[in-house]
Amino acid sequence: MPFLWGLRQDKEACVGTNNQSYICDTGHCCGQSQCCNYYYELWWFWLVWTVVIILSCCCVCHHRRAKHRLQAQQRQHEINLIAYREAHNYSALPFYFRFLPNSLLPPYEEVVNRPPTPPPPYSAFQLQQQQQLLPPPPQGGPPGGSPPGADPPPQGSQGAQSSPLSGPSRSSTRPPSVADPQSPEVPTDREATKASGTESGSPMAGHGELDPGAFLDQDSECKEELLKDSRSERGGVSPDSEDKTPGRHRRFTGDSGIEVCVCNRGHHDDDLKEFNTLIDDALDGPLDFCDSCHVRPPVDEEEGLCLSSEGQAREHGHPHLPRPPACLLLNTINEQDSPNSQHSGSPS
């Protein structure tokens, strides 16, 4: 720098008046006997300029910050003023909103703790379906009873009515992905069996009493129907459903397992013996038998609707008449199709 450069200069010898020489320690020779220095050679000159520059930068920064702060305050003041004017001028709803509150939803705070109506029970939809499927009462008589000269309705027909009602309602509760496919011959066989059960129940009701021989006939019909159903399923369904056997009752236990029992009606004929051997060969071991097909197991998800239909039949019928055995066809579920089999590796 210039002032350091001046400090590094050697002493300069000057010639004064009368040819007298003198030496300048700093600066240069000027005049007769003086030593002078330039302004950029002075140290305080550069110090002053440095301080001036620093102060100028500080002033500029402070001015810009104050300007930005003032602009922000002005914008906030304008926003507050606009909001105050809007709230003051439009305290009521606008004209095009005054006719809408009746059609708008209520606020959330008004209905969060005060529902207007409780949810309908789960059995309401099932009862409505059953009422739609029931035949209408006769026009001449009262809706709740029968004409004075007519015979009481047979209990067998009521059982035949309750069993087809429980079938669609139970199948409606099951998801379509879990339902197993069936051959087209099965529904026709079931309809024929139901029609024969209804026809056989009407003459028994005409005599006024039910004989035990009719019960045995219906038991044999149920067994034949179950065997026919199993044969048709084995002939027309995919190989995945070949393990289905007639009379098997499956119930999900809730712990990813299925309890299986065989309908044991107390008759040991050739069909049941052959049926037992088939089950032992298919399942590699003996299988538990149910106590009775007429004793209902604990109600599960698939058979929960049967109780409501039977209760209605008891209300409309006569309790003193014995109830004929109703042939219930249970739609079993393949272990491969059930969602629990994907997580559990052990066979059911």
From Swiss-Prot:
Residues 220-234 have a biased composition (Basic and acidic residues). It is found in: Membrane. The chain crosses the membrane at residues 42-62. It comes from the Eukaryota. Keywords: Membrane, Phosphoprotein, Transmembrane, Transmembrane helix. Residues 134-155 have a biased composition (Pro residues). InterPro entries: WBP1-like, WW_domain-binding. This is WW domain binding protein 1-like. The gene is Wbp1l.
